[in-house]
Each structure stands twice: as structure tokens, then as C-alpha cells.
């Protein structure tokens, strides 16, 4: 949407909203193209969302089950953003870069554990 290296002019109203949507889709496209984990998690969501709709015991349970899947995607996008910024800063090893990347990875892991817990509770208890 924006040329690399060029800062877009400030926008207001509908123009700002349309640009925001463009940036959103740019981010989704970039994450999909560059992150295998995001593609795998998206595939899992595409497969599991209909399972939640079919087997979920009620509307709230279905919403929570699908919401837990979407949370994994959100956290993966944030993790990818962290990794991208850390990688841009430099290629040499740095303890702070390691901590940032490890924390992002841990956040994705916790979101995945959340899916398991939510689904077990919704389907079996």
C-alpha cells in the first residue's frame, strides 16, 4: 500500500480507515508469505473452526472455542512482528534479542495450550 521508504501523508476520516485496512491486509499477506508457523496455524483454524461449530455444546462454547483458535493467530502475528524488528536490528547474537524472540515463542506456546484447555473443557466437562 505504501512505497518502501516513503512515509504516507496524514489522513483523516474515510481515507484513514481505508489506509488502515490496506495496512492490515499488507500485514496479513506478509505474515502468510514469510511465516510457515502462521500458515500451519491458519490451516488448523480452517479445519478446527467447523469442528467447533458442529461439536461445540452451545453458542457460547462455540464462540470461546473459535476465539481460542483466533488468539493463536493473533499471538503468532505479534511474535512475527517481534522477530522482524529484532532481525532488522542486527544479525549478531545478543541476549536481549534472544530474550525477545524466546518470549514471543513462549506466548505462542501458551496460546496453543489455551486452545487445548478450552477445547477439553468445552467438549468433555
Feature-to-residue mapping (PLM):
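Short basic (Lys/Arg) and small-residue
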Residues: 100
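Hydrophobic alpha-helical transmembrane segments
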Residues: 1-81, 89, 93-95, 105-125
